[in-house]
């Protein structure tokens, strides 16, 4: 097999594998959320389908597939169909930039654990050197899917929900982007692999500790909640005011695709937080494990951090009430934005004096 054909085959396998793992993670994040929130509310959560309700995501998926796919007569049909596809496509595209570990060797083939990564001439994995910028750009395009869903539905509830979502996501994107500037100043690179490499050697080298970026981490985490429209920032789908927000006119798999995009974005922001602030796939203590496990353990550490972030998402949902809309916007522009600018100034001073 030629080198180009082999490269394309490996790339195709990685694409299929990452999409499968991501969609499985999305399905079981929903299951975990229902279980944890159920326990918080003194309920059992899913228990009927399979042991401990583990097959509930399969039953939910089957239900969405078999439901009638209604197309209301008053909608703008091309944009109405395009909107959920755009939301899911941007969520899947952003995860393709994220590296999940170092390299994987099978026989004589060595490949980076990343869809867009390749092996360099020096035998080291090479990724896109502006990967972080691309992820921020791609995720910001997702707002178009929500805006199109509200406008094309020709419903006042959908339109109000999409307007809220667009304003909220644009507002919090500013503070989210600025919260990452401190990490970029410390690392001097947009490459996600380079940022992880600079944090290796122990947890004391992680940016949240060694670079004093705990304020930036708080800003990022808070803005990520708003970006993914999660409680307490779920104003676009406030049921008591807007029925179901921009989802109102959707049914069947089109309805499910918006939730798939939301949970996929949750996984993406958890990956980025792990890479930028918590050392990515590097272990907390170097040399902690025997060499035979070193190739597989980085993926374990990375997945463990992602699980911790997703659990915090769920915990916040079961704990905090929803903001009022004016409180939500004021919190972004009057608190998070000045705080993120102050963090940039302090980090720049720290880098200059170091």
Swiss-Prot record:
<protein>
    <recommendedName>
        <fullName>NADH-quinone oxidoreductase subunit H 2</fullName>
        <ecNumber>7.1.1.-</ecNumber>
    </recommendedName>
</protein>
<feature type="transmembrane region" description="Helical">
    <location>
        <begin position="201"/>
        <end position="221"/>
    </location>
</feature>
<feature type="transmembrane region" description="Helical">
    <location>
        <begin position="269"/>
        <end position="289"/>
    </location>
</feature>
<dbReference type="InterPro" id="IPR018086">
    <property type="entry name" value="NADH_UbQ_OxRdtase_su1_CS"/>
</dbReference>
<dbReference type="GO" id="GO:0003954">
    <property type="term" value="F:NADH dehydrogenase activity"/>
</dbReference>
<keyword id="KW-0812">Transmembrane</keyword>
<keyword id="KW-1133">Transmembrane helix</keyword>
<feature type="transmembrane region" description="Helical">
    <location>
        <begin position="170"/>
        <end position="190"/>
    </location>
</feature>
<dbReference type="GO" id="GO:0048038">
    <property type="term" value="F:quinone binding"/>
</dbReference>
<dbReference type="InterPro" id="IPR001694">
    <property type="entry name" value="NADH_UbQ_OxRdtase_su1/FPO"/>
</dbReference>
<feature type="transmembrane region" description="Helical">
    <location>
        <begin position="296"/>
        <end position="316"/>
    </location>
</feature>
<keyword id="KW-0874">Quinone</keyword>
<feature type="transmembrane region" description="Helical">
    <location>
        <begin position="130"/>
        <end position="150"/>
    </location>
</feature>
<keyword id="KW-0520">NAD</keyword>
<comment type="subunit">
    <text>NDH-1 is composed of 14 different subunits. Subunits NuoA, H, J, K, L, M, N constitute the membrane sector of the complex.</text>
</comment>
<keyword id="KW-1278">Translocase</keyword>
<comment type="function">
    <text>NDH-1 shuttles electrons from NADH, via FMN and iron-sulfur (Fe-S) centers, to quinones in the respiratory chain. The immediate electron acceptor for the enzyme in this species is believed to be ubiquinone. Couples the redox reaction to proton translocation (for every two electrons transferred, four hydrogen ions are translocated across the cytoplasmic membrane), and thus conserves the redox energy in a proton gradient. This subunit may bind ubiquinone.</text>
</comment>
<dbReference type="GO" id="GO:0016655">
    <property type="term" value="F:oxidoreductase activity, acting on NAD(P)H, quinone or similar compound as acceptor"/>
</dbReference>
<dbReference type="GO" id="GO:0009060">
    <property type="term" value="P:aerobic respiration"/>
</dbReference>
<feature type="transmembrane region" description="Helical">
    <location>
        <begin position="4"/>
        <end position="24"/>
    </location>
</feature>
<dbReference type="GO" id="GO:0005886">
    <property type="term" value="C:plasma membrane"/>
</dbReference>
<feature type="transmembrane region" description="Helical">
    <location>
        <begin position="333"/>
        <end position="353"/>
    </location>
</feature>
<feature type="transmembrane region" description="Helical">
    <location>
        <begin position="81"/>
        <end position="101"/>
    </location>
</feature>
<keyword id="KW-0472">Membrane</keyword>
<comment type="similarity">
    <text>Belongs to the complex I subunit 1 family.</text>
</comment>
<dbReference type="Pfam" id="PF00146">
    <property type="entry name" value="NADHdh"/>
</dbReference>
<keyword id="KW-0830">Ubiquinone</keyword>
<keyword id="KW-1003">Cell membrane</keyword>
<keyword id="KW-0997">Cell inner membrane</keyword>
């Amino acid at each position: 097999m030629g080198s180009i054909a082999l490269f394309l085959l490996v790339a195709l396998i990685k694409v299929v594998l990452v999409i499968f793992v991501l969609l499985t993670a999305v399905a079981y994040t929903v299951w975990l959320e229902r279980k944890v929130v159920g326990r918080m509310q003194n309920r059992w959560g899913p228990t009927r389908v399979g042991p401990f309700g583990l097959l509930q995501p399969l039953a939910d998926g089957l239900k969405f597939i078999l439901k009638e796919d209604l197309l209301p007569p008053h909608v703008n049909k091309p944009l109405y169909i395009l909107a959920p596809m755009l939301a899911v496509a941007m969520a899947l595209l952003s995860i393709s930039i994220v590296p999940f570990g170092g390299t994987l060797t099978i026989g004589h083939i060595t490949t980076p654990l990343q869809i867009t990564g390749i092996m360099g001439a020096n035998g080291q994995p090479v990724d896109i050197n502006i990967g972080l910028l691309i992820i921020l750009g791609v995720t910001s395009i997702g707002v178009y899917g929500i805006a199109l869903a509200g406008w094309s539905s020709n419903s006042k509830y959908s339109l109000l929900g999409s307007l809220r979502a667009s304003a909220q996501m644009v507002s919090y994107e500013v503070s989210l982007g600025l919260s990452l500037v401190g990490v970029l100043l410390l690392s001097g690179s947009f490459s996600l692999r380079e940022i992880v490499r600079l944090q290796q050697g122990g947890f004391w080298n992680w940016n949240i500790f060694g670079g004093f970026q705990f304020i930036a981490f708080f800003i990022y985490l808070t803005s990520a909640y708003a970006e993914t429209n999660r409680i307490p920032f779920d104003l676009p789908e406030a049921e008591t005011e807007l029925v179901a927000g921009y989802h109102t006119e959707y049914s069947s798999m089109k309805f499910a695709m918006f939730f798939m995009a939301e949970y996929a974005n949750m996984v993406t922001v958890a990956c980025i937080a792990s890479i930028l602030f918590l050392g990515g796939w590097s272990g907390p203590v170097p040399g902690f494990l025997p060499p035979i496990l070193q190739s597989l353990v980085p993926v374990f550490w990375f997945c463990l951090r992602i699980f911790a972030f997703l659990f915090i998402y769920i915990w916040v949902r079961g704990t905090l009430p929803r903001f009022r809309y004016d409180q939500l916007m004021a919190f972004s522009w009057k608190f998070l934005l000045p705080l993120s600018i102050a963090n940039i100034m302090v980090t720049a001073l720290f880098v200059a004096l170091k």
